Regions:
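N-terminal beta1-alpha1-beta2 module of alpha/beta enzyme domains
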Residues: 1-60, 66
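Flexible, glycine-rich active-site loops centered on histidine and acidic residues
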Residues: 2-12, 16, 70-108
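A conserved short beta-strand
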Residues: 60-61, 91
Length: 108
């Protein structure tokens, strides 16, 4: 059985702790580490995690697709895939119309 962990989506988590959290989760035997788009960008914590891990999969679960340019999103995913040695998994979601229009100021 595979068990995955995550890097703190709640407001009390400090970005400075994410690298250590990732290393602890890998040492504990987790198979993957996931982030979500909440109060932090979902990609940056994975970059931090990549620097302190070597085997776990690293993924977004989820990143909001409609608030980003497809080319920018593809470039970010490609860079993370290269930097992690193929361990990055891109999870995308659509979000709901009010969040896209109000939170991200993007057209629906």
């Amino acid at each position: 059985m595979k068990v995955d962990g995550g890097l703190g989506p709640d407001l009390s988590h400090d970005l400075g702790t994410f690298a250590a959290q990732a290393a602890e989760q890998e040492a504990a035997g987790y198979n993957g580490i996931w982030t979500a788009e909440t109060n932090h960008d979902p990609f940056f914590p994975l970059l931090l995690a990549a620097g302190t891990t070597s085997d776990v999969d690293l993924g977004t679960g989820i990143a909001v697709a409609f608030s980003r340019s497809p080319m920018t999103l593809a470039a970010t995913a490609n860079d993370l895939q290269a930097f992690t040695g193929g361990r990055f998994i891109l999870g995308l979601g659509s979000q709901i119309k009010p969040h896209i229009e109000k939170r991200f100021s993007m057209p629906w």
